[in-house]
Every structure is written in C-alpha cells, then in structure tokens.
C-alpha cells in the first residue's frame, strides 16, 4: 500500500497544473472578463467547480460563469449566452466555438488560441448559481473531514477520463459526481479516512474505492468493509 501511495503522490504532482499553466488560466479568464464587462458593466468572470477548488488536471477545461449585476442581474440565460457568444466569436483568440444553448444550463465552449485551453462559459445568476452552490456547499466543507480527499480526486478523475466517462452530458460522471462517490466511500471508512494522507492511507483508500464500486467482496480490513455489494 505504501508503494502505491507514493506513486499517487508523484502522480498528483505530475498531473496538476504548474505555475505557468495557472497564470495562463488566469489570463484566459481575464480576456473573457473584458468581453463580458463590455456587454454588461460590473459583471465578472469567475471560475467554478474543479477549477475554483484546484481539483483539476493539467490541460483540463476552464469552467467559467459570468456573474451579472445591477439591471443585468436577472438576464435570461439563453439571451445572455447568445449575446456573449456573438461577442466572443469576434475575438481573434477565440476558435472552435461550440454553443450549447438548449441544455439545462446554456453555455458556449471555445478554445482560447493563446493558452490552448478549452473554456466552457455560462451566464446568469439563477440556475447556474444553484448548480455551483450545490457543488460548493455540501461537498467542500464535508471533504475537509477527510485529508486524503483532494489528493485522491486527481487519480480517480484520471481513471474515469481515460475510459471516456468524464462527460456527464454523455452519460458519464463529472467532477461533482466523482467527488460525491469518493466522499461516500470515505465517510463509510472513518476513522481511517480522517487520518493524514500518508502513503499507506492513500494506497489503501484508492484500492478500496475501486473495489467498493466494482462490487468486489469486502475483506473486513479498515479500507474494505461494507455490508453488501454496491449496485447501480
């Protein structure tokens, strides 16, 4: 277990964005922010989800919400995203535009040609706020009880991504669902899961997580104890 835990720690360091990428992400968001402010004075581009909480992989998409204020505070989301999309298309740094205005949360997706990052952008303060608040409110405070949570999120997300299962709109599981699965597993294995993220803790928890969701039989150890197989 300790050897696997050391590999997990090395992988997290390798897979996390470095300082240059973090600066590129910030610059990408500032370019979008300037476009939004020209449309809706006082508005602000802000990251959400895994981007905000630093649970992102190197080169992963940049998730941004345009928070509108004042007389634009309650702008209809479809109208807002159409307006923003039209302006973003005029920018020389925006390529490969892909609008999705008919979904539950209308958004535009484009590649920033300077940073090479794909940006996914939504507008407004109603449905989008509820979605990001749902991510922030129950998951992040609860995860603080489990020091290994953020460390394990990256390798777990990578496994789902390698198998093409990271897109929630395509039937997969996005960051929020992966986080809830991991929290559910860690909550079932307290107090072991409340210990510092040492190599043996990381290795045991990662193996136990996949055995649990694979309906593997439990062996009764501190990382593999459940009363019945998990069933989808």
Specify the residue positions occupied by each region the protein language model found.
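Non-catalytic helical "accessory" subdomain of NTase-fold nucleotidyltransferases
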Residues: 1-232
